[in-house]
């Protein structure tokens, strides 16, 4: 049976939990808002049923269109409803955005992490056969799909250990990628050193 778009009320739609890509209110967003006001949403969103709800949905693809529709005052948007579980949806969220021309280091870092966690969780599921989940490391699968190296994927994921102000500096190119990765190791070491000291102070 062919899946056809369904009009869904805006208030029944929710962003994907842990969505790693920033939806910015910039000139491109303003252009999209104007387009939606004039022509409506030409490409349907992709959504999945929200767990433990009767008629609410989580967005898999189309977060920018959703934001623009809200700002344009649209009450309903067309969407394709797909029966994806959390892990499959997370992978789809990442794969549908990594092709974008401009992606911030922080976006790629959290996207790689989200997909890696989903792939690892799929690998632990007993209802999937070995043919469905290849016996490869999650970072290897991501590297192949994004045409990069396994080490590069790991280094990006390291950035998720940085505190937000430092990660913002990486996005703003005030800190280069390699020093930022090295800094993530340093910060983790400082946390490990300070934690026993802090606990020791409390015990006295």
Where are these regions (language model features)?
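Short, charged/polar connector segments at secondary-structure boundaries
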Residues: 1-82, 88-102
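Short linear Ser/Thr-Pro motifs
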Residues: 35, 149, 202-203
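Base-recognition residues in the alpha-helical recognition helix of bacterial helix-turn-helix
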Residues: 64, 155, 200
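A short linear boundary/processing microfeature
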Residues: 74-75, 83-84, 118, 159, ...
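Alpha-helical interaction elements
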Residues: 100-186, 191
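Single conserved hydrophobic/aromatic residue that forms the stacking wall/gate
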Residues: 191-204
């Amino acid at each position: 049976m062919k899946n056809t778009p369904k009009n869904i009320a805006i208030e029944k739609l929710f962003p994907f939990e842990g969505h790693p890509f920033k939806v910015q209110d910039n000139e491109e967003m303003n252009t999209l808002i104007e387009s939606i006001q004039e022509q409506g949403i030409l490409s349907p969103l992709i959504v999945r049923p929200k767990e433990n709800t009767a008629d609410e949905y989580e967005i898999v693809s189309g977060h920018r269109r959703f934001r623009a529709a809200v700002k344009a005052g649209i009450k309903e948007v067309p969407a394709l409803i797909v029966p994806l579980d959390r892990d499959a949806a997370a992978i789809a969220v990442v794969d549908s955005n990594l092709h974008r021309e401009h992606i911030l280091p922080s976006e790629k870092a959290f996207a790689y992490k989200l997909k890696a966690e989903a792939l690892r969780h799929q690998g632990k599921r007993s209802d999937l056969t070995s043919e469905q989940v290849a016996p490869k490391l999650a970072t290897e699968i991501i590297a192949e799909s994004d045409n990069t190296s396994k080490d590069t994927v790991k280094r990006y994921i390291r950035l998720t250990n940085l505190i937000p102000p430092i990660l913002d500096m990486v996005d703003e190119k005030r800190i280069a990628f390699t020093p930022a990765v090295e800094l993530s190791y340093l910060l983790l070491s400082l946390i490990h050193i300070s934690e026993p000291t802090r606990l020791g102070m409390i015990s006295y």
